[in-house]
UniProtKB/Swiss-Prot annotation:
<feature type="binding site">
    <location>
        <position position="259"/>
    </location>
    <ligand>
        <name>[4Fe-4S] cluster</name>
    </ligand>
</feature>
<keyword id="KW-0662">Pyridine nucleotide biosynthesis</keyword>
<dbReference type="Pfam" id="PF02445">
    <property type="entry name" value="NadA"/>
</dbReference>
<feature type="binding site">
    <location>
        <position position="85"/>
    </location>
    <ligand>
        <name>[4Fe-4S] cluster</name>
    </ligand>
</feature>
<keyword id="KW-0479">Metal-binding</keyword>
<keyword id="KW-0004">4Fe-4S</keyword>
<feature type="binding site">
    <location>
        <position position="214"/>
    </location>
    <ligand>
        <name>iminosuccinate</name>
    </ligand>
</feature>
<keyword id="KW-0411">Iron-sulfur</keyword>
<feature type="binding site">
    <location>
        <position position="40"/>
    </location>
    <ligand>
        <name>iminosuccinate</name>
    </ligand>
</feature>
<dbReference type="InterPro" id="IPR023066">
    <property type="entry name" value="Quinolinate_synth_type2"/>
</dbReference>
<feature type="binding site">
    <location>
        <begin position="197"/>
        <end position="199"/>
    </location>
    <ligand>
        <name>iminosuccinate</name>
    </ligand>
</feature>
<comment type="similarity">
    <text>Belongs to the quinolinate synthase family. Type 2 subfamily.</text>
</comment>
<feature type="binding site">
    <location>
        <position position="23"/>
    </location>
    <ligand>
        <name>iminosuccinate</name>
    </ligand>
</feature>
<dbReference type="GO" id="GO:0046872">
    <property type="term" value="F:metal ion binding"/>
</dbReference>
<dbReference type="GO" id="GO:0034628">
    <property type="term" value="P:'de novo' NAD biosynthetic process from L-aspartate"/>
</dbReference>
<comment type="function">
    <text>Catalyzes the condensation of iminoaspartate with dihydroxyacetone phosphate to form quinolinate.</text>
</comment>
<keyword id="KW-0408">Iron</keyword>
Amino acid sequence: MDKDLTYQIKELKKEKNAIILAHFYQPPEIQELADAVGDSYYLSEIARDCKEEVVVFCGVRFMGESAKILSPEKTVLMPVSNAGCAMADMVDEEGVIKLKQQYPNALVVCYINSTAKVKAHCDVSVTSSSAIKILENIDNKEIIFLPDKNLGGYIAEQFPDKNFIFWDGYCKYHNNIRAEEIIELKDKYKNAEVLVHPECKKEIRDLGDYVGSTSGIIKYATNSKNKDFIIATEEGILHELKKNNPNKNFYIPGGKILCTDMKKTTLENLYSTLKNMENEVIVEDEIMEKALNSLLNMHKLAEG
């Protein structure tokens, strides 16, 4: 890590009254520098509750938007303005409106991996760590879930009494994980436990000893007496896993699962963003007002 640049970023942070948030999929040097590292739900709480006036969000676009919607009075910056999420872009507001017309009695639940414009048409947002708790607190029997059909399928398995209508979206990195890659690793490391993110396909989830969010995977591996783990999610999580468990071994199916947009953040663009107060996240007032409802409901139902 560039110590001089790191020092300058820390000084700028004090000067600007800023907090740096980083997702588990961010590069190791960014995670090390961040004030808080976590999954989407945890980071949305920090963004909402922090006292700092400036939030620098090291992640992808929908995360910065969610932070701005939850804290409109704060300045939210992103080191890379074009760090997107292909899954979030698979659904548009016209598609949501059409589905709502088709299923007028359905509650519209969106994965937080959605754009602000889509959230504006949804009743509640969920994250992979909060989804089950939230759905437990929802009485509706008919649910439109978007955009991730894999996470939606996992949630639907926990609620057989509810009827789910899915959007045909997915995370290409999780969706591309193949069962053979996991079986191959299981043959090599006989006692390894398989920890799977619910954005994976059902055939991958079925191979898992545990299915859960990034924070859930880290907690499970840390508490387990096992020494070997096969990790079916983006490889950025390995930094926190190895940091918490230096004597344990972690293996990625296929050897590599890398989200290119999550890896766009660098110390250089983080420094530039703070120094010049650039790449501010702007969400139109009308969209922000409508989208806020789904995020407030997320926190209310997850904490209820």
